[in-house]
């Protein structure tokens, strides 16, 4: 009985983190070639360098939806691109301008490169849905 009481007191002292999901809808796929790659980041330091989760979805429609489950409350950012030629990289021209459609959470835009984590940041403190328009 004492053990049960101690366990219950400890359990009430350390509440469990809620696990949330982020539903991401990608709009504006122009062709049915290739796949759409989606990456999820959880910090400014890892943004565009090391994702914590990713999805690769074969294109079957102009819009698609993916879900990232079991997310702890916090700030996240999403990047995505339509990999038409299936080489798993965002192709660009001689000047570094992307040749394939791409997008970020909050439809954030960068100047001469990707936006900052801050511009793309999405706070997930409950289940959330976002939409990214490819450009």
Regions found by a protein language model. Give the residues of each.
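A glycine-anchored, Pro-Gly-centered beta-turn/N-cap motif
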Residues: 62, 67, 72-75
């Amino acid at each position: 009985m004492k053990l049960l009481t101690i366990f219950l007191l400890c359990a009430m002292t350390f509440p469990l983190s809620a696990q949330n999901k982020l539903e991401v809808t990608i709009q504006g796929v122009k062709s049915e070639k290739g796949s759409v790659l989606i990456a999820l980041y959880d910090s400014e330091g890892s943004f565009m360098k090391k994702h914590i989760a990713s999805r690769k979805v074969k294109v079957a429609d102009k819009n698609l939806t993916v879900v990232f489950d079991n997310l702890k409350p916090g700030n996240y950012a999403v990047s995505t691109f339509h990999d038409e030629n299936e080489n798993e990289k965002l192709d660009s021209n001689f000047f570094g301008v992307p040749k394939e459609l791409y997008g970020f959470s909050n439809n954030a835009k960068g100047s001469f490169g990707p936006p900052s984590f801050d511009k793309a940041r999405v706070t997930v403190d409950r289940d959330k849905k976002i939409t990214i328009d490819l450009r």
